[in-house]
């Protein structure tokens, strides 16, 4: 064991003893952004898992979000016997799980048993994107903001009712209302406190437009930490809500009558010394040349990345019409109708907001796709078109290419995209597209209440 590893293990032991930890959650994120893993005892973690990792079936990348096995995958399946892959703890992610007694969590990287990083792992893909940025002389920073709904009932009671009634904690939406925010102050206060105790800063929380809808803003950090924090916060909110007998949902559009829930991500770069590079000191109302290049790359590849930014059948119900979600490949200064909002500043606050993703996305993949698209713009010195002034929803397709209108269209675009295969490994592109095609087949085979109500009697 190296001296550095010895120091890390000693720090971990001190942390466990200080907080009287007896359970460690070891987990990694799958293709769909679901955090999966194991819970292990503190002694096993210190003496084995922290040193050598642990193993888990590669079925993590062989099933869908509902744990149904996906047919025909090259990576895994019945023919291969679903063998093991390795979970390697990233000890820098060790943190308390304050809402669970004597519990801590560690995020893991995923490797083949021979030590080779797994190309399907979203966290590994983001690591590679960050490495590419560093090779070009940049560090990437990101900040997530999530919207979600708080529902009065537990997930068990909602599912027992066949998902027919979902009752939000508020009967109407009052965006930014201090009165309506106060009605859920206990649970939102717990969320802020628990995240603070876990070392994550929530800069703000507020009520949103939908009934029982809330927004959280996570403080910016380096790109990998930002994605780690986003996963921790999403899971934490769900668990905290469950302790109150409630359900927190990050579904993009849980009801046709309600506002969609976004998962916008803000991106910026610095040089390797930490100096921000998006700001334009000579013209604080504009971006730097590098900032414009990065923005142009994000806009240019937005349509091809639709399957990552809008990964589920339900995602496309959120982006239909004037919905506060980018529906085309567009940009503008401080314009919330575009897909990419440029926010100018004389200093470190200069950034680009990707407004396409919903709260249902995988943060690692969204940040990786956004970063790699931006780096493509920098490498090729792309120039953005003129900014959209006013309502981007009314702009013609000639001026702003529409994003994919359905998951079926998005999966096809992603699979056929040459650029997707330039910025991501071929293995990932094929696997991801196949998973989305599977999801479409599952949806198409289901008879829903709308069909029954429309056709059962009259046809």
UniProtKB/Swiss-Prot annotation:
It comes from the Bacteria. Disruption phenotype: Cells lacking this gene are unable to transform isopropylamine to L-alaninol. The keyword Nucleotide-binding applies. Disulfide bonds: none annotated. PROSITE patterns: GS_BETA_GRASP (PS51986), GS_CATALYTIC (PS51987). Gene3D superfamilies: Glutamine synthetase, N-terminal domain, Glutamine synthetase/guanido kinase, catalytic domain. Residues 19-115 form the GS beta-grasp domain. Keywords: ATP-binding, Ligase, Nucleotide-binding. It is an enzyme of class 6 (ligase). InterPro entries: Gln_synt_N, Gln_synt_N_sf, Gln_synth/guanido_kin_cat_dom, Gln_synth_cat_dom. Residues 122-459 form the GS catalytic domain. It catalyses: isopropylamine + L-glutamate + ATP = gamma-L-glutamyl-isopropylamide + ADP + phosphate + H(+). One of its GO terms (molecular function) is ATP binding. Its EC number is 6.3.2.-. One of its GO terms (biological process) is glutamine biosynthetic process. The keyword Ligase applies. Belongs to the glutamine synthetase family. Involved in the degradation of isopropylamine, which is a constituent of the herbicides atrazine. Catalyzes the ATP-dependent formation of gamma-glutamyl-isopropylamide from isopropylamine and L-glutamate. It can also use aminoalkanes, amino-alcohols (L-alaninol and D-alaninol) and amino-esters as substrates. This is Glutamate--isopropylamine ligase. It comes from Pseudomonas sp. The gene is ipuC.
